[in-house]
Amino acid sequence: MDHTECNNRIEYLQNKVLELESLNENLKGQLEYFQTKFLESNLNSEGKDISSCLTEIYNSLSLDNNNNNSNSNSNSNNNSSNSNNNSYSNFNSNNNTTNNTKVIKNRNFKINLTNSNSTNSSPYIFGNNKDNSNNSNNSNNNNSNTELSNDHLSLEDNIATTNTTTTTTINTSNSNNSNNNNNNNNNNNNNNNNNNNNNNKPTSNRPPVAPRSFIRSNSDTFITPPGSPTSSRNSPTNKSSPQFLSPLSKSPLSQSTQSTTVSSPSPSWTTTVPQSKMRSETIVQSKSPYSPDTNISNKLINELASNIGAPNSNGSESPSKNSPRSLNSNNNNSSATTSITTPPTTSTPTPTTSTTTTTTTERRPEDRRSKTSPFPNVGTTTPPLSNSAHLVRTQSASGANAVKPQSQLSTSCTVNMIGGGGTPRSNNSSNGSLYHSMSSNGLIENLSTSSSLSLSSTSPSPNNSQQNLTNPFEIGADDELEVLDDPRLVMVKTENGFIVKGGTIEKLVNRLIAKHDPDFTSAFLLTHKSFTTSIELLDLLIEFYVNNKDSSSINSNSSSSSSSAVASSSFSNINCNISDLSSSTSSTNSLLINSITNSPIINSNNQNNQNNNNNNNNNNNNNNNQLEINGDKKKKAIRLKITNVIKSWVDKHYYDFSEDKQLTLKLDQFITNHIMFDMDKIGFNLKRLLTNDRVVPVPTFTQGPPTPIPPKMKSNGSEINFKDLDPTEIARQLTLYESDLFRKIGAKECLGQAWNKDGKEENAPNIVSFIKRFNQVSSWVATEIVRQEKLKDRVSYIKRFILVAQECRKLNNFNATMEILSGLQNSSVYRLRKTWERVESKPLLKNTLDELMSLMSSGANYKNYIQELHNIHPPCIPYLGVYLTHLTFIEDGMKNVLTTTTATTTNTTTTTTTTTTTTTTNTTTSNNNNQQQLNGANRSFDDVIINFEKCRKISVVIREIKQYQQQQYHLHTEEFTLRYLSNLPSIQTQKSMYKLSLICEPKEKETSSFDSGYGSVSDRPSKKEFSVTSLLNSFKS
């Protein structure tokens, strides 16, 4: 493999990388668009499901696409008609043909593409210089005239270049100078009209769609890159154009497709205008990885044009980009496709035309981070990708008129003055010196000055002008690595990506708004009261919202003033340089220079410079307007995200507002003054949620509730006792009663071990009530058993309680099951050996008890119970003691604060070390330390790194509790049974129950018959698995 082929392969692979990067950015932009539209549709909807929202978005794309297609067609026609009247340089045409001229304007030059009739038209052109030169030599009758003219030039130069294959000639005459002002004025008027038309175009919110897949040829094999020996385009016998299959229609593309090809020693690019566009092809034009306003095809064509002046591989210098070129392309095969071939030239100096405004592209390191806006550009289409024998980039003709961004341009103004009949000399100097060349009397052969006339003026950069528009929390997927270096936000990488481990309050709110992370949002809103207050959180959200308001006049004044300053400084520098030049020459030369300065040529040049500056001002204003539109779209997306956070907060955590009237009033004022002003329908929905005017979901059941079982009524009218109630109905009514208590538990009651601290009746009233109910039922079970003096009655009561526990298990009431088993394991009941001997003598009853004991066993951290809980279908009532135990371990074992930003900056490993979970033996000391950490850093959030990992673990427990609170039981109330369970009979204390137990079965010697049959008490694993004392102590206040 030779050196040339290797370079071609490298360039081919680099181009493929650019295509893949563009495809990736298109997909990112499309995803951001759908997320934004889904948020907006979700905020406006009233009970719509996801599929309905997505269907509306999809239908809106169809309508936007049809409108945009009609607009783009009309705009392209207008541009074509305007460009035919405003061409400055005309090519020599030897034959009279009817030409259809199209204009592709690219910043400071435009290409007039003149297509003539031909019998052969190919939709794609291979970028082979050898083939192009052969085709141009075979041209006789039909002309394909191509004009390459500068927007602000009127002079035509006669340039003779030496080349063995193609000769390029431009005739220059001084008679054209008199037409400068008229042509420039007409051009300025047309440009202003085009700018006004572009500004009046309706904006579209359609998403950028990924380019089409690679277009393969008839064979499925990989296409050889350009320059390889096996490439089909190098074969001299290959005369016909290859057939390309469309990925949408799976048929060869129509040959009536008009395209424009720029051929050069490097791979060429094609501008294609298909006759008809499908909706997936013309949804929207994506942004290139190079600039926010141009697509890939235009960018690469601009780079190709800017590299013409650089030395080529043969060591010869290509013509300068500053001079316009007229190429006579006599190719009879290019009627539908006009190619501009730039041949290699010798080192002969190339002249520059009068008053040239050059555009240089600054080379910068490649930035592969996503620059995709959540909203697409206006009036552009997606360039489909192709995979032909060489790289072919296609786009619509209307998309070729995109203006390059000002941030990557530096405008240089150079004055080159020539006398009558003189030949201009090429400006090969890098400092842009002023050259005078006159042939009359040979007075001045070559005169140059050391003072440069090259004025470099940088127009306002989009980055600089949009500093106020950028939001401080726009964190994309590709920016996570930068966030890792932020000392105020601690992040760790997991299998599912990066997660937040800690951060300041501002950074956490920043992340809450910027990233669509339901887990993070839920964890933050559930646990925010552990490190801040609801009022302060609302203040931060309001601040972010107000800072992202639309601003329509941020860039207009600054851009106009800077442009006028550039224009004035341009003329002052020119006059200064001319005066310096006249002072440094002899008197004879000074007279000549004065006559040159006052000549009509210089006056017309000054007029041209003024027109150029006016056009630049118009372009700057258009760019600034586009930047402002894009900035407003980003701000609108940010405001939608903030509004969605507020909606989630009010909808799913309304208890924060129902208990804080000041918070409700402040949010109501914010909705009225800001959200309803920007988005009235969304504001109305938020107000409805804030007033708790929401639709309460009514559960629907496929089957009716079971028929209640009434108790056995006594004939004498005495009170009902436990034996009169049915075990199944006891389980049902017990479940209904405890379900109401469980569903009242709020998320804030689970924070900070509020159920174990002072003021628990106020901070966690529902958890305290639930714990009291658990202890009450357990004591009631034990009391009912020890009150029975007869052995037979005690066995009967134990049997009934086991049956009630079994029915509670069938109803998924694990809490009641645990209550009954705790009562059976009470020390006063457990010591009744004779009673348990009778119970275990019944195999069916014993097996049922063993199954329940095994299910609710505390071994392996309640492994069997947790596994069963996750396998059942709600409704259910979980055993609350497991959740309270987990919350206690998290609160005691993890700190509330990781470290400060200063410590994080100096030592990064300290942040990671402090997140390790440590178990403390003194619960009171740990709680006091955590509280002191928050109180010591009270409201100084700039220095506090909140341990969000602790908040996340707490939120996991709270979310599981809330998950089982959603669905209610479908049971009827039985009045007598529920009244009995609500007012349980008098319950004895532990000492009283133990005395009753001694009455039932007095203490016996260790050699009793019971001990001889079962051994010691420790030999009964099914009964010894529970420790009633530990259970009761864990729920004591």
Curated annotation (Swiss-Prot):
InterPro entries, per database record: Ras-like_GEF (IPR008937), Ras-like_Gua-exchang_fac_N (IPR000651), Ras_GEF_dom_sf (IPR023578), RASGEF_cat_dom (IPR001895), RASGEF_cat_dom_sf (IPR036964)
Annotated signal sequence range: none
Gene Ontology cellular-component terms listed: plasma membrane
Coiled coil: 5-35
The N-terminal Ras-GEF domain, residue ranges: 496-694
Keyword Signal in annotation: no
GO molecular function: guanyl-nucleotide exchange factor activity
Disruption phenotype: Poor in phototaxis assays.
Positions with biased composition (Polar residues): 229-239, 282-300, 372-387, 424-437, 1027-1037
Disordered: region residues: 65-100, 114-150, 166-387, 414-437, 451-472, 602-628, 907-935, 1004-1037
Coiled coil listed as a keyword: yes
Residue stretches making up the Ras-GEF domain: 726-1003
Keywords: Coiled coil, Guanine-nucleotide releasing factor
Biased composition (Low complexity): 114-145, 166-200, 240-276, 318-360, 907-930
Pfam families the record matches: RasGEF (PF00617), RasGEF_N (PF00618)
GO terms (BP aspect): cellular response to differentiation-inducing factor 1; positive phototaxis; protein localization to nucleus; Ras protein signal transduction; thermotaxis
Protein function: Promotes the exchange of Ras-bound GDP by GTP. Seems to play a role in chemotaxis.
Protein name: Ras guanine nucleotide exchange factor E
UniProt source species: Dictyostelium discoideum
Gene name of the encoded protein: gefE
